Amino acid sequence: MLYHSIATYFDIMCNLYSLTKGQAAIRDWFRARHDRTGNLPVLPGIFPDQLAPIVRTGADSERELVMARWGMPGPPQHGGAPVTNIRNVSSPHFCGWLAARNRCIVPATSFCEYEDTKPPRKTPIWFALAACRT
């Protein structure tokens, strides 16, 4: 299973990823003590602004599996619209978000980049540890 710290790896995992492992596998892999996701379905396509599971440190200092919306608040000078790729981690706007208390693990089994092919459509290219993307 691939995993990425939100604060560090946004540039790797662009705007589409999948999670085909079940809750038990996620809890075991990341040693999440609490599961607050409810009945989590297989998520073959997770896009920005959608809810998806993350593993974070809870109020009791234990790891917990919870749902979170994908995206970070954007800089006010750019309208505050949510962003999904943080390339300038030295930007004053994002410095506070990089603190350990704001970090989490985003479980993923594969992620997608788009190949720059002829318009009107770009070709999706999936990356995973296994060819079957599971």
Named regions from a protein language model:
Residues 1-134:
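Short linear sequence motif anchored by a di-proline
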